[in-house]
Amino acid sequence: VDDDGSLRDLKERVSTYPAATRRRILIESPELLETFLSQMTMAYQRGDYEMVAHRRASIQATYFNMLFALNHRYHPGEKRLLEHTSRLEALPRDFTRRWRELQLASVDAPEITTRTAGLVDELLALVSTRWKTRFSPSRVDEHCEGRPQADTPSES
């Protein structure tokens, strides 16, 4: 029973993904991903595998926030993320397999930073293409060299 129309009003408010939220996530997240990836790389180089695991988790949280925002979808929470991404239109190539491999990789695996960087690069390329955001080269480190950072976005 929705006598006062409050349920109807709530459904209308959440029926479309807020453009301002999407814009904020897509503007701020690339820099966060760059920072976390740089920290992950430095932690790996010094053998701090606990920090590598922490940065991988930070990258995952930011990455999925960005992926759902790009697709105009509310983030479903931490459970069954890959199941939820299967319904998204804009995804990096072979995303599910590659993400699973990354998550199952040991934190001391030599390829962990390059696999992570590859997925981040492809997500940022999708943002650039789908959101028509201009990017400029990053100045983070050699693992992130030439990688995009948000410059001046335009909504699409």
Model-predicted regions and their roles:
Residues 25-29, 55-56, 112-119:
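Amphipathic alpha-helix face/heptad-repeat signature
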Residues 1-47, 145-156:
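Conserved NTP/Mg2+-binding pocket subregion across the NTase superfamily
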Residues 44, 70, 85, 103-106:
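Hydrophobic residues in alpha-helical segments
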Residues 38, 42-45, 64-75, 79, ...:
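Charged/polar positions within long, soluble alpha-helices
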Residues 72-100:
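Short, charged amphipathic alpha-helical segments flanked by flexible coils
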Residues 55-62, 83-84:
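Small-residue-rich helix-loop
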Residues 40, 91-156:
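Terminal (often C-terminal) interaction modules
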